[in-house]
């Protein structure tokens, strides 16, 4: 499959995965995903207090109580109907809309003071669509507004995961029996991986790969820290901080990132990107 076909294939695979019962169950979790997310939101909270917030990729509503603690002027969107319905059921008094982050035309320019796109949701679309999302976020943010976004690390431990990578022969018949049984149980993972492998693609500073989540049912973008900073700069943002998911530490250029599964970026709108940029 050529690179031009990757975004459509990603969309089909990921939309299918988000609507499974397993995905809906997983999205019911509560609280912070990791220390890095907590650190990133804590950094922007004082400045965003009381400002209108847009929560992109809200899923089943995990982030609703976390962000409404900062401001009651809150709007959430997600592009998966089943998750929007569940989120509305769990948070009936909140404004939850069915919307794709690539098209936020329902919102006026400069409508929000803070936009959050959590749980690596931006990774679920191809590179060109990713840039479209960033331009749309820039448009709906006020001048000087803040953006929190997470993305998978191409140099981290999650990049290049494969089903059955744990399988090893052992002369112990009991252990080998359990391993074979678990391998049989993992057959759906293998089928998904082999089906999605045709979508794998490498670009400058980023790659598209099948991820282990949802039984290897999703295909996502993995980016280097420098690439994500470049994308933000190109779409009118200045990166103010980057946090590691594993321990919440603030990352610096040049340090070892091999233990970081994904990044949490805090960026500020400094300009509007040129048309078509």
For the regions a protein language model found, what residue spans apply to each?
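A short SAM/SAH-binding and catalytic strip from SAM-dependent methyltransferases
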Residues: 114-128
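A short acidic, Gly/Pro-enriched loop at the edge of an enzyme's catalytic core
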Residues: 102-115
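Conserved class I S-adenosyl-L-methionine
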Residues: 1-59, 66, 260
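Core SAM-dependent methyltransferase catalytic element
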Residues: 252-277
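SAM-dependent methyltransferase
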Residues: 150, 154-231
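A short glycine-rich, Lys/Arg-flanked "PGG" loop and its adjoining helix->strand segment in the class I
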Residues: 131-143
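Class I SAM-dependent methyltransferase SAM/SAH-binding core
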Residues: 60-103
């Amino acid at each position: 499959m050529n690179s031009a076909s990757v975004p459509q294939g990603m969309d089909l695979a990921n939309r299918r995965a988000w609507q499974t019962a397993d995905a809906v169950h997983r999205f019911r979790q509560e609280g912070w995903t990791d220390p890095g997310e907590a650190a990133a939101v804590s950094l922007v909270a004082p400045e965003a207090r009381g400002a209108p917030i847009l929560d992109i990729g809200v899923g089943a509503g995990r982030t609703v109580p976390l962000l409404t603690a900062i401001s009651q002027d809150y709007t959430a969107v997600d592009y998966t109907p089943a998750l929007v319905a569940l989120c509305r059921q769990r948070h009936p008094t909140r404004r939850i809309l069915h919307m794709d982050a690539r098209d936020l035309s329902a919102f006026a320019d400069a409508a929000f003071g803070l936009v959050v796109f959590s749980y690596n949701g931006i990774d679920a679309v191809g590179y060109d669509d990713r840039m479209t999302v960033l331009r749309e976020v820039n448009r709906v943010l006020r001048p000087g507004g803040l953006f929190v976004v997470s993305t998978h690390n191409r140099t981290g431990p999650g990049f290049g995961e494969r089903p059955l990578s744990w399988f090893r022969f052992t002369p112990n018949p009991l252990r080998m029996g359990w391993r074979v049984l678990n391998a049989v149980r993992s057959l759906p993972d293998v089928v998904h991986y082999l089906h999605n492998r045709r979508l794998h693609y490498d670009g400058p500073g980023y790659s598209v790969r099948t991820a282990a989540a949802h039984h290897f049912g999703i295909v996502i973008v993995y980016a280097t820290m420098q690439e994500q900073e470049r994308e933000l700069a190109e779409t009118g943002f200045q990166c103010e901080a980057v946090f590691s998911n594993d321990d919440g530490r603030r990352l610096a250029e040049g340090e070892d990132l091999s233990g970081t599964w994904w990044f949490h970026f805090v960026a500020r709108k400094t300009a509007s990107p040129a048309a078509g940029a």
